[in-house]
């Protein structure tokens, strides 16, 4: 992890597309604007899907670690 403060952690290890993004959407829907979600994943599809999800839904991908699994993502909820 990093020194970024997180408000919620989502562990999607072992899940495959489309489950990680579906759970991300469901989780972030119940968060407040500006809160940070940390996601842990091992599905290679998340390296494409999570950034696309953030762009499409107007959330901010603060940081990602995708060089080797498990992949890590820090998302700041937008509007």
Curated annotation (Swiss-Prot):
Record-linked SUPFAM superfamilies: SirA-like (SSF64307)
Entry keyword Cytoplasm: yes
Residues annotated as catalytic: 17 (cysteine persulfide intermediate)
Highest taxon, organism lineage: Bacteria
Any single GO BP term: tRNA wobble position uridine thiolation
InterPro entries reported in the protein's UniProt record: Sulphur_carrier_TusA, TusA-like, TusA-like_sf
A GO term from the CC aspect: cytoplasm
HAMAP family for the chain: Thiourid_synth_A (MF_00413)
Record keywords, A-Z: Cytoplasm
Role played: Sulfur carrier protein which probably makes part of a sulfur-relay system.
Protein name: Sulfur carrier protein TusA
Compartments (UniProt record): Cytoplasm
A GO term for molecular function: sulfur carrier activity
Transmembrane regions: none
Taxonomy of the source species: Bacteria, Pseudomonadati, Pseudomonadota, Gammaproteobacteria, Pasteurellales
Family according to the record: Belongs to the sulfur carrier protein TusA family.
